[in-house]
A protein has these predicted regions:
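Short beta-strand->loop structural element characteristic of the AMP-binding/adenylate-forming
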Residues: 14-17, 44, 65-73, 141
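Conserved AMP-binding A3 loop
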Residues: 1-28
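Conserved AMP-binding/adenylation subdomain of ANL enzymes
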Residues: 25-41, 49-89
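Conserved ATP-binding/catalytic segment of the ANL
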Residues: 179-213
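Gly/Ser/Thr-rich phosphate-binding loop
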Residues: 89-92, 101-160
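Short beta-strand-to-turn element immediately C-terminal to the catalytic PLP-Schiff-base lysine
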Residues: 17-19, 153-157, 175
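Catalytic cores of nucleotide-enabled group-transfer and carboxylate-activating enzymes in metabolic
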Residues: 159-177, 181
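Alpha-helix/helix-capping structural signal
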Residues: 21, 95, 122-123, 186
């Protein structure tokens, strides 16, 4: 069993447990979606106490026998490391993008080696997606999911709008206020069902996490 201690919605750590069987299912789902093979190079900046590290980057890379490059995120170092390893698959969240934009070389940065990029962990602006596309990223996949319900539950391709057809193993409903319910689990995430966009958390996050670096 894997036990994760997260602190997103509140400052108090939240404990989430996953069996290895469930994690293996999520890892295999990610490998199929990304199309990961031994020819890929994965650049991973997700901390080890996040579900993303296990089901989006590190473990899928291991299972697919891909090359895994793991580093703590720092904007200048990320750009330097990217140039060195030329990854074919990356995963970044909106906060990473905000920090990368502060680097002078970002405006002309070439990311054409990337055939698939995952983003998510909160509302993703179309401006961010378009920025990465303009730098050569072939597919920017906006994955929705969470620690309790590992992503991807559903995906938006090159768009902040999601395809609400859930991936295998998930049943999704929406309450009248737009809150997403996954396999009976109340997520606390509010969507605009008409536009198919992730709007906000139901309760404002007060925790200090890797997402607020």
């Amino acid at each position: 069993m894997l036990t994760l201690y997260t602190s997103g919605t509140t400052k108090a750590p939240k404990t989430v447990n996953h069996t290895w069987d469930d994690l293996n299912t999520a890892i295999d789902r990610s490998i199929r979606e990304i199309g990961l093979t031994s020819n890929d190079t994965v650049l991973d900046v997700f901390p080890a106490n996040t579900i993303a590290h296990y089901t989006i980057t590190a473990m899928p890379a291991y299972r697919a026998n891909a090359t895994l490059v793991s580093a703590k995120f720092e904007a200048n170092h990320y750009i330097k490391l990217f140039k060195e390893v030329q990854p074919t698959y990356i995963a970044l969240i909106p906060r990473h993008w905000e920090l990368l934009k502060e680097v002078d070389s970002w405006k002309t940065f070439n990311m054409s080696s990337v055939r698939y990029m995952v983003t998510g962990s909160g509302p993703v602006p179309q401006e961010m997606i378009d920025d990465f596309k303009s730098k050569g990223v072939q597919t920017v996949a906006n994955w929705y999911g969470m620690t309790e319900q590992p992503p991807p539950v559903f995906i938006g391709y090159n768009s902040e709008e999601f395809d609400f057809e859930p991936k295998e193993g998930y049943a999704v409903d929406f309450l009248a206020d737009g809150e997403c319910i996954i396999n009976g689990f109340a997520t606390g995430d509010i969507f605009d069902v008409q536009s198919r966009k992730f709007l906000r958390r139901k309760d404002h996050s007060t925790g200090s996490t890797w997402k607020t670096i």
